[in-house]
A protein has these predicted regions:
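Conserved positions at the start
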Residues: 41, 80, 109-111
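A broad detector of the eukaryotic-type serine/threonine protein kinase catalytic domain
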Residues: 63-66, 130
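Outer-membrane beta-barrel pore domains
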Residues: 3-6, 15-17, 93-228
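Active-site cleft segment of glycoside hydrolase catalytic domains centered on the general acid/base Glu
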Residues: 69-73
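Outer membrane beta-barrel
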Residues: 1-63, 75-77, 84-92, 146-148, ...
């Protein structure tokens, strides 16, 4: 399997989900701030079965995202690789790595996660670490964990009602681009401040002919003192 063109880079669990596959109305910090990457490039995938399925994906990318397609191919190789191990017990083990270079600073991201699915129950936990070369910025830590349970409806317009709860966290985050500070120095700045969040809610999943999901969520944010 191969793909060329605009795509969601094969990296992380939650950031790799399309909008209709998201469980919450608002994406996790990993999917929205720290690990969200769409880009232009080429990727290949390979499936193998060793008693259980293994899905391997890797690609080379422009590194500039979707809106600034110039000169990035000549700045170095930007790559991403991902492996999924679909164990027979209902556990999906995922590991991925990505390297980009948005400026003279190389950013390398490492991600690992577990998804457990049994009947109507789904539990997921994911951790991402983001490293900046040249000690340009302190490494970023991000975590996302949630639980989802589906209550199946036998009659009426609803196919199921899902109850969900999530906790996610991120430390101070930089996009890897340099900005001029008050002293005229070119430095990386904090684009997204350290925060944590709890989310709870329900999802109403309608059956035919109106196949759609209605997500109703409550969010509570926690910021460090004087961070914003």
């Amino acid at each position: 399997q191969s793909t060329i063109g605009q795509m969601r880079v094969p990296f992380t669990i939650d950031a790799h989900r399309s909008p209709h596959q998201q469980y919450f109305a608002n994406r996790s910090f990993i999917a929205k701030q720290v690990g969200n990457v769409r880009d232009v490039g080429a990727a290949v995938g390979y499936n193998v079965n060793v008693g259980f399925p293994i899905i391997l994906e890797a690609g080379l990318f422009n590194g500039s995202g979707l809106t600034n397609q110039k000169d990035y191919w000549t700045k170095g190789t930007n790559y991403s690789a991902k492996a999924q191990f679909l164990l027979p017990c209902g556990l999906n083990v995922v590991g991925s790595i990505q390297k980009v270079k948005p400026s003279d600073v190389t950013v390398t991201m490492y991600d690992g996660g577990l998804t457990f699915h049994h009947k109507q129950l789904l539990i997921e936990a994911e951790y991402l670490y983001k490293h900046y070369s040249k000690d340009a910025f302190e490494g970023v830590h991000a975590f996302d964990g949630f639980i989802n349970y589906d209550f199946l409806m036998k009659k009426g317009p609803l196919q199921k009602i899902s109850a969900l709860a999530r906790y996610d966290f991120m430390s101070n985050h930089s996009n890897g681009k340099r900005y001029e500070n008050s002293n005229g120095e070119s430095v990386l700045k904090v684009n997204d401040y350290k925060r944590s969040r709890i989310t709870s809610g329900i999802t109403l999943s309608f059956a035919k002919p109106f196949i759609s999901d209605v997500r109703i969520n409550f969010e509570k944010y926690f910021y460090a003192k004087n961070s914003i």
